[in-house]
Amino acid sequence: MNMKALKQQVGFTLIELMIVIMIVAILAAIAIPSYRQFVVRNAESQVQARMQELDIELNRWRASALTYKGFTPKKVASNGDVSYVYDATDNKTIYVPKGSDSTNFHYKITLVDATTGSTLAPASTGYSTAGSSWRMFAEPNSNYSTAHKIILNSAGLRCKTKNNDSSITVASTNCGTYSEEW
């Protein structure tokens, strides 16, 4: 009996390994962009929900104070403590998701008086504001290049536009030519 005939092949051939590598590469090429889109959509959903929460808080404030002047957003810490404060010293900025700051945010919401463009914060801060209307502008972190810029105001405007439209700012009264409602 021939000893070579009894030996069985052990391991994989080069062609089998190349086929497995190609399959993994194809799956990665499909999965990674889909995951990135999911992350961006999730961040957009979070900021839209936070903007709607702020809208409700603003309307409650106005119902009791008869003006938006003096409004500060509710902030809930991870341990459940509640405070009323903006996330930045300019008294206009709110970072999303909750608990994030200027180094790790997904979206930055700027909340201003629609008439003056200044903060709605209490007058003791030295800012001047009319308090009759407000405007929110959410801008994505630079890591989310495909995300939308989002606008919500007290007049009922709800729109979003692609992030690469640099003409859309907190002072904008609409979302531009290629906008959509949300």
Q: How would you label these PLM feature ranges?
A:
Residues M1-F12:
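N-terminal leader/signal peptides at the extreme start of proteins
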Residues Q9, I21, S133:
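Short coil/loop residues immediately preceding or within conserved phosphate-binding loops
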Residues Q9, L27-I30, N42-S45:
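Residue-level signal for short amphipathic helical patches enriched in basic/charged
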Residues V10, I15-I19, V40:
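Internal alpha-helical transmembrane segments of multi-pass membrane proteins, especially GPCRs
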Residues L17-S34:
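Alpha-helical hydrophobic helix detector
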Residues R36, R41-S45, Q52-A77:
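Alpha-helix exit/C-cap motif
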